[in-house]
């Protein structure tokens, strides 16, 4: 088959002219038969200095294609071809035409810089991470020592800061399962809560300690001192204040301890006598009924 590249004696209208009619270029089935057309296409491309993309040879398999060359533009290809086929139709463009827009280049560099900042992983050995881990462990120990549960802490924080705080939040913080940013924010809040909780606990302990100091601890009396007190009780069950003080000095005991011992001993003696009298009365009654 013969090739008919152009009409009008192989002349064409320059791209910068005002003519708007397209110049039809008919490609044939064989690449060898279309060599003249390729030469004219090369001439067209050499004058199109304003293009920013190359156009491949316009045949795909055995399907003929027609491309219109408009004033200053070329219709892009419909299909995407492999890179090694795009070099057959036209010579490569000059490097200035392929240069990237400076504005776009700066934008891409800025985007890459921001992406790097966002995606940059946190150093797990940094002082901030170690400090956060140490606080989480100390917080758990001090919380348990104060007698608070994770639910107690979550409810206390939710009442002040909002419903986003819960038992799950405290649990994730203690187990280091929050993001670094959220954990740092929560650390400041928990530090304040822990400070107030320990102040309340200190006041409570002072109150309990004062009540405990009011109660005197139980005094243990040795066996020898008990024997001496029993002898004094057998002689006189109700000693005077001077006698109690003298016995306390002899036995190396407090006066109040000796006084309380004699009171308790008299009460026990009274209970024994009452129980004995009731037993004797019951025996006498039964003896009389048997008669």
UniProtKB/Swiss-Prot annotation:
InterPro entries assigned to the protein according to its UniProt record, in alphabetical order: HD, Homeobox_CS, Homeodomain-like_sf, Lambda_DNA-bd_dom_sf, POU, POU_dom, POU_domain_TF
Biological-process GO terms, alphabetical: adenohypophysis development; B cell differentiation; cell fate specification; cell population proliferation; determination of adult lifespan; inositol trisphosphate biosynthetic process; negative regulation of transcription by RNA polymerase II; pituitary gland development
Record's keyword terms, sorted: Activator, DNA-binding, Homeobox, Nucleus, Transcription, Transcription regulation
Keyword Nucleus: yes
Domain POU-specific: 124-198
Motif 9aaTAD: where in chain: 5-13
Subcellular location: Nucleus
GO cellular component assignments: chromatin; cytosol; nucleoplasm; nucleus
Keyword Transmembrane on entry: no
Annotated family: Belongs to the POU transcription factor family. Class-1 subfamily.
Descriptive protein name: Pituitary-specific positive transcription factor 1
Species: Rattus norvegicus
